[in-house]
């Protein structure tokens, strides 16, 4: 929705005129003073600079629309507006070279504005981005708003399963080490190394935490599941794998493969399945040699862009007008 620039508010300045006295005893009549006209607020200037989200290169020849006022970015990616002040207005960018971009900006005072847009080409694949970030593989055509963390989550690592049975310390060490690396690796350092606390309790529903837990009776069709970017959410790892399981979770040397842990952390950070067997977030059955798979380069490229957008950003690249609350989603993997 595009918001028009608000009309300026005019104030009226009231002046009081006082008559003087002459040397004579007769007073001169007071001459009435006409009221002043309306005062026009000083114009404000918005000076902007448009760059690529990945790489930071200037984006030239991009059409700009601010509240219905149009211009084009210069060779250096710059643009400028001068008008009467308002409050906020929607700013949009469009060109064959970028994914259309839209955001809301304040226009109440003179200011500089740094904006970035997703440049097409150079390895960026919009269809892949929609699968990984908007769940277009899991629910084709029903694109999700962006979900992510805005601060580094703390991890609560349960030391017992859901029935109270103790978990092997060596397995807990593996999970902790994998999680600490995965959070920073997935986000390219946008999130730091998480604090990990161990115990028999839970931090589900507690803001700032992700709880890692283990069902007492293992599932037969998956190796894990997680809520997608839920503050106070959880990850389940299938520590107890039934003999009837068709998921193929166990591999030599691991109770739960490192790739499964990294995959579930990906969900907890806001990612979905891609359907590509070469990806860590594929959501497909994998082979033993992939048990220690790391995120691929094109997965990391897409996540880096997503972590430069606010929660609630919608397709193709439109920021919300205000903060949003999103209902929890849960994703399971084979």
Can you say where each PLM-predicted feature lies in the sequence?
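Bacterial signal peptide processing site
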Residues: 19-23
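Metzincin-family zinc-dependent endopeptidase catalytic domain
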Residues: 171-277, 286
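C-terminal motif of bacterial Sec signal peptides marking the signal peptidase cleavage site
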Residues: 14-17
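Metalloprotease/metallohydrolase-associated module, dominated by Zn2+-dependent proteases
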Residues: 233-256, 272-334
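Short, ordered, surface-exposed loop/turn motifs in non-cytosolic proteins
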Residues: 44-47, 52-68, 176
């Amino acid at each position: 929705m595009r918001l028009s620039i608000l009309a300026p508010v005019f104030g009226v300045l009231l002046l009081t005129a006082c008559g003087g006295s002459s040397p004579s005893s007769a007073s001169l009549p007071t001459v009435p003073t006409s009221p002043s006209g309306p005062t026009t607020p000083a114009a404000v200037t918005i000076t902007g600079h448009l760059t690529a989200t990945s790489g930071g290169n200037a984006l030239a020849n991009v059409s700009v629309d601010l509240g219905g006022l149009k211009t084009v970015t210069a060779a250096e990616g710059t643009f400028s507006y001068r008008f009467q002040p308002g409050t906020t207005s929607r700013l949009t960018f469009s060109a064959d070279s970028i994914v259309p971009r839209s955001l809301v900006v304040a226009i109440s005072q003179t200011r500089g504005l740094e904006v970035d847009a997703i440049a097409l080409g150079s390895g960026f694949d919009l269809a892949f981005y929609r699968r990984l970030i908007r769940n277009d593989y899991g629910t084709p055509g029903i694109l999700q708003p962006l979900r992510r963390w805005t601060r580094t989550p703390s991890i609560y690592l349960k030391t017992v399963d859901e029935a109270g049975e103790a978990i092997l310390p060596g397995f807990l060490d593996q999970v902790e080490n994998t999680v600490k690396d995965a959070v920073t690796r997935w986000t390219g350092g946008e999130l730091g190394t998480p604090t990990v606390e161990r115990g028999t309790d839970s931090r589900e529903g507690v803001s700032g935490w992700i709880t890692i837990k283990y069902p007492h009776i293992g599932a037969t069709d998956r190796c894990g599941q997680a809520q997608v970017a839920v503050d106070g959410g959880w990850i389940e790892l299938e520590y107890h794998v039934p003999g009837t399981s068709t998921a193929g979770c166990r591999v030599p040397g691991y109770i739960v493969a490192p790739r499964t842990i990294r995959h579930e952390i990906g969900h907890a950070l806001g990612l979905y399945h891609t359907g590509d067997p070469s990806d860590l977030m594929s959501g497909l059955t994998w082979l033993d040699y992939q048990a220690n798979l790391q995120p691929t380069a094109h997965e990391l490229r897409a996540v880096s862009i997503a972590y430069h957008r606010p929660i609630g950003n919608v397709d193709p690249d439109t920021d919300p007008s205000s903060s949003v609350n999103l209902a929890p989603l849960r994703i399971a993997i084979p």
